[in-house]
């Protein structure tokens, strides 16, 4: 029974013609899509975008890496040689990544081998061993040594010697863990994305996604975001402060302009003495209560004597005005002793200077009745009033004398 008969189902619908597209690994489709998208293999399967040869960015990375690994100047590896060998030998991306794993092992286990081999021979023999490990004998994709020699321009005996020396340097340990393959794939993707972005001057969305998966780029991006956040906070604080300062300045200017346009109020009168005490002392009229003259005098003298005793040290003494011309009448009434005196310089009863001198004509109304001049608010007040300096001390003495004369 042939293979086609074994693969037929009950209905006989399976065809062997599509067997080359059959995938045995579950993640093969995802891996192929990832390689095509991130390693610049393209999506057009009908043209030259298949996975049977290396893409141009991958070829550049391979040349750079192998030149550093094998620094021998003999047969130095070139990109044209890489493209020719990969096209003639149908090198897949997985074989190329496995060859990079082998070269990395040689750098750590046997660096002397890399010093004696050329970079072109190292590329050819590493790709041949990786392809033989992936595609075992009996597969259609296998390539014999003569074909590899023809693709690389090397004789078969020389190629066999290179293969034996390579396997001896590797200690025949060709097994590779799949995690190592994916680590190399991730590293290769980041190198390709960074190199192509720098060459173009801008990065595609796929390149940015690849770079952000790397820990170094994540750390750099995180620090950049932190600095941007700090700068934004500082700018926000500066903006708010400037706005607040501008508002405060406008308020101060508006208030100052309002105060300058309004009329300035007159300064308050800082007087500690009531106005009625600073006015000229006018002789009071004779009280009508004749039965108790002393009580009337005590009531009229009690308040001035209290305020005078408190405010007399605080108020400066008023200078008396010049004496007017002598009055025509020979008699004057003293407000301290309530008696008529002639024109003596001092009062005989209280021994105070006599300043009760009238300066105008005598009004017959209050002089004929023996009364003192009217009050300031009286409608018949004299046109000129002579200010008088009354001593509160003398008033107190007069009150005591009156209480002695008129007891009770």
Swiss-Prot record:
Membrane-crossing residue ranges in chain numbering: 233-253
Localization in the cell: Membrane
Keywords: Membrane, Transmembrane, Transmembrane helix
Database matches in CDD domains: CYCLIN_ScPCL1-like
UniProt membrane topology term: Single-pass membrane protein
GO CC annotation terms, alphabetical: cyclin-dependent protein kinase holoenzyme complex; membrane; nucleus
Coiled coil: none
One Gene Ontology molecular-function label: protein kinase binding
InterPro entries listed in its UniProt record: Cyclin_PHO80-like (IPR013922)
PANTHER family: PROTEIN CNPPD1, PTHR15615
Family according to the record: Belongs to the CNPPD1 family.
Protein name: Protein CNPPD1
Natural source organism: Rattus norvegicus (Rat)
Lineage: Eukaryota, Metazoa, Chordata, Craniata, Vertebrata
């Amino acid at each position: 029974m042939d293979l086609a008969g074994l693969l037929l189902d009950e209905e006989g619908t399976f065809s062997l013609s599509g067997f080359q597209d059959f995938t045995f690994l579950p993640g093969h489709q995802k891996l192929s899509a990832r390689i095509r998208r991130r390693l610049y293999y393209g999506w057009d399967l009908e043209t030259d975008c298949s996975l049977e040869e290396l893409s141009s960015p991958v070829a550049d990375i391979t040349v750079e890496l192998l030149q550093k690994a094998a620094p021998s100047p003999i047969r130095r590896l070139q990109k044209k040689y890489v493209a020719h060998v990969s096209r003639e030998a149908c090198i897949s991306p997985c074989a190329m990544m496995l060859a990079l794993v082998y070269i990395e092992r040689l750098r750590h286990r046997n660096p002397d081998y890399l010093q004696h081999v050329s970079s072109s021979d190292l590329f050819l023999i590493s790709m041949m061993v990786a392809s033989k490990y992936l595609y075992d004998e009996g597969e259609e994709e296998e390539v014999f040594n003569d074909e590899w020699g023809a693709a690389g321009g090397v004789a078969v005996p020389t190629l066999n010697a290179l293969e034996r020396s390579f396997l001896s340097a590797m200690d025949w340990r060709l097994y590779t863990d799949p995690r190592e393959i994916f680590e190399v794939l991730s590293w290769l993707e980041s190198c390709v994305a960074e190199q192509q972005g720098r060459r173009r001057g801008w990065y595609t969305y796929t390149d940015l996604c690849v770079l952000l998966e790397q820990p170094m780029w994540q750390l750099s991006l995180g620090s950049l975001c932190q600095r941007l956040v700090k700068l934004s906070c500082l700018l926000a604080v500066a903006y708010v402060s400037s706005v607040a300062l501008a508002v405060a300045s406008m308020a101060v200017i508006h208030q100052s302009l309002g105060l300058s346009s309004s009329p300035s109020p007159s300064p308050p009168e800082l007087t500690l003495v009531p106005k009625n005490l600073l006015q000229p002392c006018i002789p009071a009229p004779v009280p009508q209560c004749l039965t108790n003259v002393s009580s009337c005098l005590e009531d009229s003298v009690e308040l001035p004597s209290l305020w005078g005793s408190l405010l007399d040290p605080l108020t400066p003494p008023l200078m008396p005005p010049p004496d007017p011309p002598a009055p025509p009448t020979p008699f004057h009434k003293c407000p301290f002793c309530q008696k008529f005196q002639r024109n003596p310089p001092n009062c005989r009863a209280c021994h105070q200077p006599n300043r009760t001198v009238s300066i105008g004509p005598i009004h017959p109304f209050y002089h004929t009745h023996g009364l003192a001049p009217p009050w300031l608010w009286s409608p018949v007040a004299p046109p000129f009033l002579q200010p008088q300096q009354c001593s509160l001390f003398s008033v107190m003495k007069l009150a005591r004398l009156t209480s002695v004369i008129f007891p009770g």
